[in-house]
Design a protein with these regions (language model features):
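Short glycine-rich, Thr/Ser-proximal phosphate-binding strand/loop in the N-terminal lobe
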Residues: 2-48
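Short beta-strand-loop/turn "lid" adjacent to the catalytic site in phosphate-handling enzymes
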Residues: 53-93
């Protein structure tokens, strides 16, 4: 099985989170952007989304991030790495 790619688009209003297996979109979810949330809070949110759609951490082999909210990029990147163990590709990479 091909590992899943976690995708996160950090927008001013929403975070759009998705997972791809090759070119197939497996799920998409949205969270309200909240600049006051911590890395741990975002990690909990990601874990909840994975649980909601029936995916485990070990199924993710990569992470791609786009962002227009630089002050959240680091926290969300670290949260994604903590959950998936995968290195990210995104702003500054």
């Amino acid at each position: 099985m091909i590992g899943l790619l976690l995708t996160i688009d950090i927008g001013n209003t929403n975070l759009t989170i998705g997972a791809y297996s090759g070119e197939e979109l497996k799920f998409v979810s949205r969270l309200a952007t909240d600049r006051s949330r911590t890395e741990d809070q975002y990690a909990i949110e990601l874990k909840s989304i994975f649980d909601l759609y029936g995916y485990g951490f070990d199924e993710f082999t990569g992470c791609a991030i786009s962002s227009v909210v630089p002050e959240l990029t680091g926290a969300i990147s670290h949260a994604a790495k903590r959950i998936t163990g995968s290195r990210r590709n995104g702003p500054g990479r």
